[in-house]
């Protein structure tokens, strides 16, 4: 499970606690984006994401904390933004709908690109027979210099500016290179 803010973290922790089986919650170091805390702790349906913004051509699939940067970047391109919430199981119905209605899907996660959530999305797209263009944004398989969280996100192309660069490259038809940063 990959919460995008403090409220979702609380609800996903509740979801994991009530789930009859193993559960893991990904969350970044430091503080959250500052979401106001709602009083309820209702669990979320396992394996269900949520569309946070409707757009055209490009869909940004945010796993966890990068949701805020994805929403900011989406404004410049009228992109759809999905809060995926779950790495396993993936929301296959939402993925199918996004693959049918968009030219490009870009996964965004604060995790390793190789073997991460984006890889799981690409495996599912291939197995389901979707030929949509896909890109993965995440932490490349190389040393990331020490720094504050914002600087490290920028280094990996996981800030709003980096996401915008990736969208622009994808729309221009530039080929993706595994592990590249925006």
Which residues make up each language-model segment?
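Thiamine diphosphate
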Residues: 17-182
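Conserved thiamine diphosphate
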Residues: 1-18, 166
């Amino acid at each position: 499970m990959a919460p995008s803010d403090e409220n979702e973290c609380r609800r996903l922790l509740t979801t994991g606690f009530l789930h009859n089986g193993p559960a893991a919650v990904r969350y970044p170091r430091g503080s959250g984006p500052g979401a106001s805390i709602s009083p309820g702790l209702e669990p979320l349906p396992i394996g269900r994401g949520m569309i946070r913004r409707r757009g055209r051509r490009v869909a940004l699939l945010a796993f966890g904390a990068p949701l805020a940067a994805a929403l900011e970047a989406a404004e410049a391109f009228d992109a759809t933004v999905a809060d995926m919430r779950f790495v396993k199981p993936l929301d296959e119905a939402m993925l199918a709908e996004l693959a049918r209605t968009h030219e490009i899907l870009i996964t965004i996660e604060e995790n390793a690109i190789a073997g991460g959530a984006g890889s799981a999305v690409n495996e599912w797209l291939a197995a389901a027979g979707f030929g949509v263009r896909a890109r993965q944004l995440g932490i490349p398989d190389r040393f990331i210099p020490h720094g504050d969280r914002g600087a490290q996100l920028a280094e990996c192309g996981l800030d709003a500016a980096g996401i915008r660069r990736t969208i622009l490259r994808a729309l221009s038809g530039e080929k993706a290179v595994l592990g590249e940063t925006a």
